[in-house]
């Protein structure tokens, strides 16, 4: 007597479905960085812009923006002196972004409230908990 297994997928079909599902997840992640953003935010308490170096402004433009808005930079650094800071972060081809670093999640929240935007006056920035 044959042992019929109705309603069960053959192993090869299950493997194909799994491979397609994984490929779809990888494609979505490569375009949106949704998993990486979640890990950065929830686990590391960081926020990154994920732009390529070629998409960033020149180092001189970044330094000019920081100088023009020195009052806001001072306000950010005053959140927790010695434990909050601002750096120009060059990426190697003459372009740069800004990194705001901080000691606690509360510091990060205050930095985000002061900046109030996805860029610092047009310059992409990262938030790093150190």
Predicted regions and their residues:
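Hydrophobic membrane-insertion alpha-helices, especially the h-region
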Residues: 11-30
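Generic surface-pattern signal
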Residues: 40, 44, 74, 78-81, ...
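Short amphipathic alpha-helix segments
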Residues: 60-83
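Short glycine/threonine-rich beta-strand-turn micro-motifs
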Residues: 45-53, 80-107
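Short proline/glycine- and acidic-rich turn/helix-capping motifs at secondary-structure junctions
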Residues: 56-61, 123-130
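N-terminal Lys/Arg-rich, disordered targeting/topogenic segments
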Residues: 1-7
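N-terminal presequence-like segments and adjacent domain-start helices
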Residues: 26-67
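Short amphipathic alpha-helices in soluble, non-transmembrane regions
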Residues: 108-118
């Amino acid at each position: 007597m044959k042992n019929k297994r109705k309603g069960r997928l053959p192993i090869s079909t299950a493997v194909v479905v799994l491979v397609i599902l994984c490929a779809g997840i990888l494609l979505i992640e490569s375009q949106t960085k949704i998993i990486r953003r979640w890990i950065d935010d929830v686990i590391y308490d960081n926020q990154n812009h994920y732009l390529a170096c070629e998409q960033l402004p020149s180092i001189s433009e970044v330094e000019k923006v920081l100088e023009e808005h020195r009052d806001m930079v001072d306000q950010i650094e005053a959140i927790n002196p010695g434990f909050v800071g601002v750096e120009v972060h060059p990426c190697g081809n003459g372009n740069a972004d800004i990194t705001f670093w901080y000691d606690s999640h509360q510091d990060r929240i205050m930095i985000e409230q002061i900046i109030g935007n996805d860029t610092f006056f047009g310059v992409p920035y990262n938030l790093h908990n150190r």
